[in-house]
């Protein structure tokens, strides 16, 4: 082994611990998911969204939330939207007359701000539409996973595609489990975040897989474990720089972007961290169980 390949971090000795961690984490996330469920937003369970602007200055969200909760018309969510004068109210779908509930909220808001308020929009999502959105969200995630599987299968071999899909499923389950644990609201923006996570994680995995394929041709006398370790080290600087710069932007959105963007940015932060982890400690070690060798690469070239 050359000096270049000697001075490396030995990821091999950490694979077992990482696999134990991943297995326990997935079991925990699945348990939380099935026992606690997901906190679905009005996009998926129906309800009403009201966007409002205060004409009398900044809004005290806590005080406003306390005032509206006295109406006793169901679960109501109040969040800042953009500036400190803008906010949105989300009212879950109920068996009562929805228009009456909306009017009650409007009257309460008008009274709270002494009529110095403007109602910018009112959107209703019925049970049929919410059901269609749930199906569309599940279909979008399933199709993206299938497309990734097909892409990896064509570009590499079936062994690589299985490893990649395993890592992607790991990332999605972990992210949904964390959302269930902390009761973050699941809406369409979270579905978009999950699809972005799938693409980000796949990109990380493909970079490592491409280097593994290249090194399988280069180091004929090494096994897949040694090749994997060399390949991870060779792409490590790229992985760290990409992940850190992405996380820097996401943390900025989380802390500065306002409450309305917290869910999306939180999902992306979790996804980037776990996606980077899975590309190294889930997808790559799995290759040894699929008997990837130099012959696999040579067969691919023919």
What is each PLM-predicted segment?
Residues 1-302:
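A structural signal for conserved, well-ordered secondary-structure elements
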């Amino acid at each position: 082994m050359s000096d270049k390949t000697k001075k490396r971090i030995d990821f091999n000795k950490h694979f077992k611990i990482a696999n134990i961690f991943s297995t326990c984490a997935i079991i925990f996330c699945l348990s939380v998911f099935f026992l606690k469920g997901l906190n679905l937003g009005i996009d998926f369970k129906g309800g009403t969204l009201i966007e409002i602007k205060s004409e009398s200055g900044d809004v005290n969200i806590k005080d406003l939330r306390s005032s509206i909760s006295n109406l006793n018309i169901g679960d109501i969510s109040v969040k800042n939207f953009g500036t400190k004068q803008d906010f949105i109210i989300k009212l879950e779908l109920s068996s009562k007359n929805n228009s009456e509930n909306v009017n009650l909220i409007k009257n309460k808001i008008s009274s709270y701000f002494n009529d110095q308020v403007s109602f910018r929009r009112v959107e209703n999502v019925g049970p049929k539409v919410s059901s269609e959105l749930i199906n569309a969200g599940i279909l979008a995630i399933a199709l993206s996973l299938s497309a990734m599987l097909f892409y990896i299968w064509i570009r590499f071999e079936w062994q690589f595609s299985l490893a990649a899909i395993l890592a992607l499923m790991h990332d999605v389950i972990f992210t949904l489990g964390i959302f269930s644990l902390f009761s973050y609201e699941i809406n369409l923006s979270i579905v978009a975040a999950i699809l972005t996570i799938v693409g980000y994680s796949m990109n990380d995995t493909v970079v490592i897989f491409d280097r593994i394929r290249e090194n399988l041709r280069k180091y004929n006398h090494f096994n897949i474990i040694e090749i994997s370790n060399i390949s991870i080290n060779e792409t490590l600087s790229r992985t760290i720089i990409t992940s850190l710069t992405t996380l820097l932007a996401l943390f900025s959105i989380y802390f500065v972007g306002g409450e309305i963007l917290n869910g999306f940015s939180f999902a992306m932060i979790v996804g980037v961290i776990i996606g980077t982890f899975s590309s190294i400690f889930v997808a790559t070690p799995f290759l040894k169980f699929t008997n990837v060798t130099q012959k696999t690469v040579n067969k691919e070239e023919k």
